[in-house]
Every structure is written in structure tokens, then in C-alpha cells.
Regions:
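Structural motif
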Residues: 124, 241, 385-388
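Dynamic helix-loop-helix/coil hinge segments at AAA+ ATPase domain boundaries and subdomain interfaces
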Residues: 1-10
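C-terminal accessory regions
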Residues: 309-432
């Protein structure tokens, strides 16, 4: 396959070639970030699929597969993959013709087939960030494909879908190729070593101490942490991120950083924020969706107004109308000015099983959060030059297998430097 590939990539490429001639429908390519999974996908499309077609011609048989499609489980992953490969990429949901549907009888959001749903045949389908495929989506992938070859690309050591211990992709005995030779972080051996150690912990369940390395894996005191936050976050810097386990701790960090910047209002013109949950609105007759984790810039904010939520019980919500920009789109949305009140209302109507008001609150108001700190779950799929990790908050998780994955995902978000703060419980390895 040529010297352009390392040994792991070459094994996967050879396996993919054999896979195209086999009766197997699905294949897995797994590995941590920075090992060349995206490069390998391009190589398989540009080199191996043409080799397969040439082999079919030599054998005097037609090529079975007529189309190659690149997809990902999230909009963010699809965008990253499209930019990295210079190929059209869409979400697997869009490809299959699925939308999230609010079930007013149960209060749950489920996947529903649209008029665009059809059964795809004779295609080679790549699905990136496959660790996020839950049982519901996995079933629909099988329903929506016939005589296709599906390549799941991801990292089986990352965090699993919500309420599932592991993606069903990794519970099956599909052909499995693992890439472990790093291409990212290859200038930081200490980062490579700790990421390998934490990956091993996910696989074995054995926690080992985390050893600081000055300038690469720094362990800070309270005062040092405060100084570093001021240094990196006084002015907005999208190359740094603070990550923690709980939403409460994330909110504390973001509130502190907004105070450092002397922000006085719930929202400031020019502020960069991220969308917390998927949101759809209409522009004319066209539906526009802002996906979870999409970056949003506030362009203009109007005066505060009150919205009726439950007038019979004198329940109102204070909001502002804001002009925002996300990607190349500009649109006007309503933003709750008191996020705590907004969240309490959602939880109240959820507990009351009043699904009409519950979904009305979730669907009519954009839930924007500061981008400087996020949960580890939200950070999965992103990389930053410097990552700050709150170890005390992470230690509050009581599930060792979850902690192993949280540590692994947290550390593998960094390109150059990790900053540690707080205490990691001894049962989770501690600090060496």
C-alpha cells in the first residue's frame, strides 16, 4: 500500500480491500485522536476503492458499489471532516432522512423518518464519531441500508451515548482495525505517554498515578490556577478550554471569566457563545437549525420583554431579542435573561409531565452558554492547544469505568498542554 501509511493504517487499508469482496456488511476503524483516521478515510476512497474497481474489472465482474458517502454523527464532526477531506459530508441523520421528534405523550425526543427517508443500496458509507451511535440510531442505520458497506470510524474508548454503557457498534463482532501510532501530539512525548496510559486504564480498569511534566502537564495550586485563568481567558481565546464533569462547575467557571471581562449583562454584544441544545426556527418558509455546540456570535441585543408561559398561573419569562450569527447565517432569536429561572421552569414542567409547556420552553428559546468552559461530554470531538481539567469535580463521579473514559477524553482534547487543578482521588490514580 506504499510508505505513505504507517503499519496500523496499512493493516486497516488491506483489511478494507478484503472487506469490499467479503460478505461482511460492517467494519470498524478505531483509534484515539491524532492517529490519522481522517487521512486513512481519504486514502481508502482515493486509492483502495479504485483498486477494488480495477480488481473487479480484471475479474470480469461489475463493481457492486456505485456511491461513496461520508457522514458523521454530529454537525460539528461533519463540518470538521468536510474541511479535513475537502469532500461533502453530512450527518448520518440527514443522510438517512431522520429528524428529532418531540413525543408529547412521553416527553422524550426520538428519531423519526421524514419524507426523505429511503433505503440506500449498493453504497459505501463512512460514519465518523461512531462512538456516539446509540441503539436507536444503530437500528435505523440497518433499516435504511441494503447491500451496503458501512465503515464505523471513531474511538471505542471515548464516552458512550447517553444512558448506554457502550455504543452497540462496539458490541458486535465486526472486523476491527485499531490505529495507535500517533500523528497529532507527536511533538509532545509526555502527552502521548499519558494519553496511552489513560487509554490503557479504559481497557483494563487499572488506574495509575498521573505524573506532572513541567510545561506540558502542569499541576497548579489555587493561586497558580487563578493566575493562569486570568492569563488565558481575560481576553477570549478559542484555543483554550476549561473542562469539568458537572454542569454546575462549568457554570461557575464561565461566570468567573465573565466577571474578569467585566461583563455586566446576561449577554454582551460581540460575545462568542455556544448553543447548548439543537434549535430550529423559520426564516421565511425555510427551516434553519442551530445544532448543539454550534458557535454563535451576538451581533445585536434589543430591550428586555416578557413572554407568557402559563398566564393562568402568572408564569412569565424575561427574554431579549438578539441578532446572532452562526456560520454564514444571521437570524433573530429570543434569549432567556435569567438562565436559572429558565432551567427551573423546564424542570418544573418536566416533573409535572406538562409536555406542551416543556417542549415550548425548549423549542422557542435559544439556550446559549459561554464557550470558555464546558463539560467533558460536550468537549468530546474538539481539540484545543491548552486544556484545563478540574480533577476535584471529575472525582465526584462514582463510576470507575466512567471516570476512566472521562480522564481519557479530557486529556486527549489537548494538542500541546494540559493544566491540572484540584485533587484526583487515590482510587482513580491520584497525582504522582
Amino acid at each position: 500500500m506504499g510508505d505513505i501509511l504507517n503499519t496500523d493504517q496499512r493493516n486497516a487499508a488491506n483489511g478494507f480491500f478484503d472487506f469490499l469482496f467479503s460478505s461482511e456488511k460492517e467494519l470498524i476503524i478505531s483509534g484515539p485522536g491524532g492517529v490519522g483516521k481522517t487521512f486513512l478515510m481519504s486514502y481508502l476512497i482515493d486509492r483502495i476503492i479504485p483498486e477494488y474497481e480495477n480488481a473487479c474489472a480484471l475479474l470480469g465482474k461489475p463493481s457492486v458499489y456505485t456511491t461513496v458517502t461520508m457522514t458523521a454523527t454530529t454537525n460539528k464532526a461533519a463540518e470538521v471532516l468536510s474541511v479535513a477531506t475537502n469532500r461533502p459530508t453530512q450527518t448520518i441523520h440527514s443522510y438517512l432522512g431522520l429528524v428529532v421528534y418531540d413525543d408529547y405523550s412521553t416527553g422524550k425526543s426520538i428519531l423519526k423518518k421524514t419524507n426523505d427517508w429511503r433505503v440506500h443500496q449498493n453504497e459505501i458509507i463512512f460514519i465518523d464519531e461512531a462512538s456516539m451511535i446509540n441503539s436507536e440510531l444503530f437500528k435505523l442505520i440497518h433499516e435504511g441500508t441494503k447491500n451496503c458497506k458501512i465503515v464505523y470510524v471513531g474511538d471505542h474508548c471515548q464516552l458512550a451515548p447517553v444512558l448506554e454503557p457502550l455504543s452497540p457498534v462496539y458490541k458486535k463482532n465486526f472486523p476491527f482495525y485499531e490505529l495507535l501510532e500517533p500523528m497529532r501530539n507527536n511533538g509532545q512525548p509526555a502527552l502521548q505517554a499519558i494519553c496511552n496510559q489513560l487509554r490503557e486504564t479504559v481497557e483494563t480498569g487499572i488506574f495509575k498515578p498521573i505524573t506532572p511534566v513541567k510545561g506540558v502537564i502542569d499541576y497548579l495550586s489555587d493561586q497558580e490556577m487563578e493566575n493562569e485563568i486570568k492569563k488565558h481567558f481575560l481576553n477570549p481565546d478559542n484555543n483554550c478550554r476549561i473542562i469539568a464533569y458537572t454542569n454546575k462547575r462549568v457554570i461557575d467557571y464561565n461566570d468567573y471569566i465573565r466577571e474578569l471581562r467585566q461583563y455586566k449583562n446576561p449577554y454582551e454584544v460581540g460575545e462568542n457563545l455556544v448553543n447548548n441544545t439543537s434549535f430550529s426556527t423559520m426564516i421565511g418558509r425555510k427551516s434553519v437549525t442551530i445544532s448543539a455546540e454550534d458557535r454563535v456570535k451576538l451581533l445585536d441585543i434589543s430591550k428586555e420583554i416578557q413572554q407568557e408561559i402559563d398566564p393562568e398561573n402568572n408564569v412569565f419569562l424575561d427574554v431579549v431579542e438578539a441578532k446572532i450569527q452562526t456560520y454564514n447565517r444571521q437570524l433573530r432569536v429570543l434569549l432567556p435573561t435569567n438562565k436559572i429561572h429558565y432551567k427551573k421552569l423546564i424542570n418544573y414542567y418536566k416533573n409535572q409531565k406538562d409536555w406542551v409547556k416543556y417542549f415550548s420552553l425548549k423549542n422557542n428559546y435559544l439556550d446559549l452558554r459561554p464557550e470558555d468552559a464546558s463539560t467533558i461530554h460536550k468537549a468530546q470531538g474538539s481539540t484545543f492547544d491548552t486544556v484545563f481539567i478540574d480533577l476535584s469535580d471529575l472525582s465526584s463521579c462514582r463510576q470507575p469505568d466512567m471516570v476512566a473514559r472521562l480522564l481519557y477524553v479530557a486529556f486527549t482534547r489537548a494538542r500541546n498542554r494540559i493544566v491540572l487543578y484540584g485533587n484526583l482521588k487515590e482510587k482513580y490514580g491520584g497525582i504522582g
